[in-house]
């Protein structure tokens, strides 16, 4: 089952998110990832396998600087377990990161709509469509964009 952890504060986010994800390991998952905002851009790291793989990749979160972020453990429902299909998913500009728990039943027509508008998809997941929809609807007000999505 998927797990989601988020953090906004004054401490470095990545180690806190990794700790939070470790508390969800008992639920089962096939991959893990996180997105950390460093004040200028969003950096993501994703890995198939146990959380330890992501911890090693990020040196316990030490090489992902920033005080806000999201993390996710994934149990695949759309798309095979892979680094690309792991969450978080980004919009094409790399300015929006999304994690999601559940199934988007109508993601195929939504994906087609966004592809017709020029959005490029790299994963096989239903969640990636959310990042592109948020990008499409965002006009300066995040709550308005989320409501429209």
Where are these regions (language model features)?
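Conserved short alpha-helical segments that host acidic/polar catalytic motifs at enzyme active sites
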Residues: 1-149
